[in-house]
Amino acid sequence: TAGYEDEPSHTVTTVIVPHNAKSGQLVNYLAYIDSNGAQCAPSYSMRQGSKFLNDDLLNYQQLLFSTFLNEGWILTIPDYQGPQRAFAAGRLEGRMSLDGIRAALNFGEIGLEKNTSVVTYGYSGGAIASGWTAALQASYAPEINAIGFAMGGTPANVTSTVQSLDKGVFSGLCVAGITGIIYAYQVVQDWFQNHLYPKGNDAIEYARSHCITDIFSRYPFSHVFSDDFFRNGSSILYDPTIQSVISDIVLGLKESETPKAPVYMFHSQHDEIVPFSDARKTSHNWAKHGADVFFQEFSDLPIGHALSEITNIPNSLFFVRDRFAGKPFPKGYTRKVTGNGLEEPNASLAGLGELVRAIQDIQGREVGPADSELKQFILDRN
């Protein structure tokens, strides 16, 4: 694959072929890694035989992962952060994702044809990769038969995302995001060498060797953008050197980076981790530039960032099913507001009862209203 400046690079993608595999259908599954430790990448955590992503906080990803496999879809699961473990470096992640698809299509033992239909899915940090896969596919990998892109809880603007997280219970994501950008861009790495205080340097080093649960638990309610961590910490995001990089990884700004295949986006209006307004703005920009976008909003107050994906698993499943079935997709821009994903009539279809019960179990036992159980889990570990 290639780095941000077109330098040669490399990464790994893990391909899973279910026993009931359907030929000609590939799902590019972009797990939310949201961290910088090498052991957090899917190829490492899955090879170790651990629970998916080897992280207690993220284990419920297995539910959607298993649902896709049960459909008979072959999955390619790339380590899209690359050897730099560059979390939040969207353009880099998009390239790694697309080259992972190429690798799967070119690996003869899997038996996929070059014109295999591909649908991409990603949530949260995985939606950064999914969004940039959609944005870059037409220019970077036009030969891929991309027929749909799904993404939810999308951090479309890294700057506003980390600003909203600073000093909150999930402020560890600020540390992980900064660390990813530092190691993706040499110019940023050079700049930070002169701006890191000991506490900031310790945080970067910690993030480089840990997964997201540990990072969350070590840095809740931290004022990351402060002089405790960095010289002129409150203004580093506005420094010209940093601005030149982060302003170039805002999804939806360039008309030339408009997805050519249908886009399904979903987001809670009350998302406490990723700003809702940024994702909606990206959806509008893409539609304005000619993309077909279906944007689904969840209005229920208890539906926070984690519950958005969990309760929307049936709709994500239907989107992928419909793309492979060649069903029509609404043209232009479509907005739909529901309380949560399980309110959709199709969620109660025959055959989905067990899935819905599993979702409701996780919703109440592991996540809680407004992600309250997740927040308490982080604080209990601190």
Swiss-Prot record:
Belongs to the AB hydrolase superfamily. Lipase family. Class Lip subfamily. Gene3D superfamilies: 1.10.260.130, alpha/beta hydrolase. It catalyses: a triacylglycerol + H2O = a diacylglycerol + a fatty acid + H(+); a monoacylglycerol + H2O = glycerol + a fatty acid + H(+); a diacylglycerol + H2O = a monoacylglycerol + a fatty acid + H(+). InterPro entries: AB_hydrolase_fold (IPR029058), Lipase_secreted (IPR005152). Its main location: secreted. The active site is at S124 (nucleophile), D271, H305. PANTHER family: LIPASE 5, PTHR34853. SUPFAM superfamilies: alpha/beta-Hydrolases. GO terms for biological process: lipid catabolic process. It comes from the Eukaryota. Secreted lipase that hydrolyzes acylglycerol lipids such as triacylglycerols and consequently releases free fatty acid. Can hydrolyze 4-nitrophenyl palmitate to release 4-nitrophenol and palmitoic acid. Due to an absence of fatty acid synthase genes in Malassezia species, secretory lipases are essential for the yeast to generate free fatty acids from degradation of sebum and assimilate them as lipid sources for growth. Plays important roles not only in lipid metabolism but also in the immune response of host cells and pathogenesis. It holds the Pfam family LIP. This is Secreted triacylglycerol lipase LIP5. Glycans are attached at N115, N157, N232, N346. Its EC number is 3.1.1.-, 3.1.1.3. Keywords: Disulfide bond, Glycoprotein, Hydrolase, Lipid degradation, Lipid metabolism, Secreted, Virulence. One of its GO terms (cellular component) is extracellular region. One of its GO terms (molecular function) is triacylglycerol lipase activity. The keyword Secreted applies. Induction: Constitutively expressed regardless of pH conditions or exposure time. Disulfide bonds join C40-C211.
